[in-house]
């Protein structure tokens, strides 16, 4: 009897040890590594053309990228204060749609519905041609925008994309998992590999598709469920008849009932 009891204790101990090891592994793979020292690159830092308004700062960089940057008014004259920890949205437009990016997406993320959650900076990044392609270049640009605006929190960057921009936002997250805390994808069609999925487990995704978005849905419909199932606090929002859409502020995910702004509130305020 004592032998049986001893064996039971040993088995229980091994089980608890295994559970503890599994918990430590799970914690490790779901803990996001963030950008360390940022990389200064003069072609991405310096601008050959500038134009500032009360709301937006425009820059044309020597690297060939144009962008608009919004810094909340209360921080605009204190942009070198690193202690402010201002979150940043990086917005990626659809293919050949850079002409409408500022008015459509820039306006959405400077809306009080977003800014009342937390005062956030907004970077509207225009593709060098009609679409985005080079992940290294984009990472360098974002890093150099942060170097110039030290009030931005490099640990709290959220990507937003529509169509090809949504595809690219997920692609960029897979390329450099330390860059984004979360990714918002509307009508994106990136087909994630299992190896990439392991890299982005700590990143939070809101991934939206519509079944009647022919050609897009078929490509992206495997990625969304994988992200929701395995990635931290992630949502797959699948619609029946929404067409080729971008994620909007009042969105609610069918099925789960998750509310976009509530999800975003949690993302932005989480340490």
Locations of regions flagged by a protein language model:
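A domain-start/cap signature at the N-terminus of enzymes
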Residues: 7-13, 19-87, 225, 231-234, ...
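Gly/Ser-rich "nucleophile elbow"/oxyanion-hole loop immediately N-terminal to the catalytic nucleophile
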Residues: 75-76, 80-84, 131-163
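Active-site machinery of serine-nucleophile hydrolases
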Residues: 86-88, 92-138
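Alpha-helical scaffolding within the catalytic cores
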Residues: 102-113, 136-137, 141, 187-198, ...
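Short, proline-enriched alpha-helix->beta-strand connector loops that line the catalytic pocket
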Residues: 118, 199-205
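Primarily recognizes the serine-hydrolase "nucleophile elbow" in alpha/beta-hydrolase
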Residues: 155-200
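C-terminal catalytic histidine-bearing segment of alpha/beta-hydrolase fold enzymes
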Residues: 206-208, 212-224, 228-271
């Amino acid at each position: 009897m004592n032998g049986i009891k001893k064996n039971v204790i040993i088995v229980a101990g091994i089980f608890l040890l295994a559970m503890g090891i599994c918990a430590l592994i799970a914690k490790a793979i779901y803990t996001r590594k963030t950008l360390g020292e940022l990389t200064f690159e003069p072609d991405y830092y310096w601008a050959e053309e500038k134009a500032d308004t009360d709301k937006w700062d425009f820059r044309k960089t020597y690297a060939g990228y144009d962008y608009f940057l919004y810094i909340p008014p209360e921080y605009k004259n204190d942009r070198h204060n690193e202690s402010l920890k201002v979150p940043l949205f990086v917005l990626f437009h659809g293919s050949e749609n850079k002409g409408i990016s500022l008015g459509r997406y820039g306006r959405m993320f400077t809306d009080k519905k977003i800014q009342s959650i937390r005062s956030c900076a907004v970077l509207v990044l225009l593709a060098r041609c009609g679409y985005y392609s080079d992940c290294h270049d984009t990472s360098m640009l974002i890093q150099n925008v942060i170097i110039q605006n030290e009030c931005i929190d490099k640990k709290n960057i959220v990507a937003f994309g529509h169509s090809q921009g949504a595809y690219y936002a997920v692609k960029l997250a897979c390329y450099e998992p330390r860059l984004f805390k979360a990714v918002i994808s509307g009508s994106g069609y990136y087909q994630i590999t299992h190896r990439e999925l392991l890299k982005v487990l700590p990143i939070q995704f809101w991934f939206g598709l519509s079944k009647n978005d022919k050609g897009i849905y078929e490509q992206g419909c495997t990625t969304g469920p994988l992200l929701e199932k395995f990635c931290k606090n992630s949502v797959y929002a699948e619609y029946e008849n929404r067409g080729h859409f971008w994620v909007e502020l009042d969105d609610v995910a069918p099925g789960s009932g998750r509310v976009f702004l509530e999800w975003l509130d949690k993302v932005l305020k989480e340490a």
